[in-house]
Amino acid sequence: MCDIRYFKRALSLYKTAVREYQTGQADEYTMNTVAYSLQQVVELVLKCHLEFVGVTVPSTHDISKLVRMCKNNGACITITEWIDDNTEKLTAWETQTRYNMDFFVERDKAAKALKMIKEFLDINYISYEKY
């Protein structure tokens, strides 16, 4: 069964990403924190929807794999075009922003991701008012 805490954690991470983007320094390390948080938002939402349809969620951060699993298992989730087109980038944000000291996410890419992931949350009715 879906653990609602996945959604609550995803919303908390989204809020953290927004706050870091708006009030943090515009340096590469801050943008990496924003990107990592956004990847986690998408991952948690996908995993919750998989659990909801009875799929055992694997220990993976691979957004492509999770999207594929949602589609193949009838998860009741809308995968936006931006999410579908950026699965590899989002997956890279999980590992590269944490372990590759030469990897940096540009501010404009973080801004675009903030907007598009908010759209993903909204279209799937994931909001603070609901949870």
Give the ranges of each region predicted by the language model.
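Terminal alpha-helical segments
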Residues: M1-Y131
